[in-house]
C-alpha cells in the first residue's frame, strides 16, 4: 500500500458531512473506494489501462504539494493497480487514512484568510443529496446562500471536522504533526 496526500471539499447531504473530490463530483465512500471507468465501459475490466482511461484515485506524493487554501486535506491509502506520475499516484483502490487541519482557513466568499475558530460552514439542511457546503467567515457566510432562508444551517468548522473524522473513522491531525506521522 502507498500513502498519498490529497485535497477535498466539503459535501453535505441528509447523511451529514462527507468528503468530495475537488476536481469532480465524486463523494468519497466511508471505507474502501473502488475506481470505476467513466470514459469507456469496455475499459471497465482493465482499470488504469493506458491510453485515454483516466479512472482511479489521485493523490500527491508529499503533503507539501497540497493546496494550502483547500478546506480539507487528507492522507489516503492507495493499492491495487497503481500508476506513479511525477507528482503523485493514480490507484484502483483508495481509502481515507487521516484528515488534516488546514494551515490557513479561507473564507470562500471573500477569499481572505481567517482564524480557523472563526470559520463557519453553511449548508442547505433540506433533505437533498447534492449540496456542496460553503465555508466562510461570519461576515460573508450568508452570501453563500444568496439570501438567508430558514433551511440554511451553520456549523463551526471544528464541528464539521469532528463529524468527518468520526464518519470516516480516522484521526484528525494538526499540520505540524503530518511530517512526523507520514513523512
Please state what every model-predicted region is.
Residues 123-142:
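Cysteine-rich micro-motifs
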Residues 44-109:
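ADP-ribosyltransferase catalytic core
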Residues 7-58, 63-73:
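Glycine-rich loop/turn
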Residues 41, 108-111, 138-141:
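Cys/His-coordinated zinc-binding microdomains
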Amino acid at each position: 500500500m502507498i500513502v498519498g496526500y490529497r485535497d477535498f471539499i466539503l459535501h453535505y447531504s441528509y447523511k451529514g458531512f462527507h468528503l468530495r473530490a475537488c476536481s469532480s463530483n465524486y463523494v468519497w465512500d466511508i471505507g474502501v473506494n473502488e475506481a470505476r471507468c467513466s470514459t469507456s465501459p469496455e475499459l471497465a475490466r482493465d482499470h488504469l489501462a493506458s491510453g485515454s482511461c483516466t479512472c482511479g484515485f489521485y493523490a500527491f506524493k508529499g503533503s507539501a504539494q497540497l493546496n494550502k487554501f483547500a478546506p480539507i486535506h487528507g492522507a489516503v491509502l492507495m493499492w491495487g493497480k497503481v500508476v506513479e506520475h511525477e507528482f503523485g499516484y493514480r490507484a484502483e483502490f483508495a481509502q481515507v487514512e487521516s484528515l488534516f487541519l488546514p494551515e490557513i482557513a479561507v473564507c470562500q466568499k471573500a477569499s481572505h484568510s481567517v482564524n480557523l475558530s472563526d470559520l463557519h460552514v453553511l449548508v442547505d439542511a433540506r433533505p437533498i443529496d447534492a449540496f456542496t457546503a460553503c465555508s466562510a467567515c461570519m461576515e460573508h457566510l450568508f452570501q453563500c446562500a444568496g439570501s438567508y432562508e430558514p433551511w440554511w444551517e451553520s456549523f463551526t468548522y471544528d464541528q464539521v471536522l469532528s463529524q468527518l473524522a468520526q464518519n470516516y473513522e480516522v484521526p484528525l491531525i494538526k499540520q505540524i504533526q503530518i511530517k512526523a506521522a507520514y513523512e
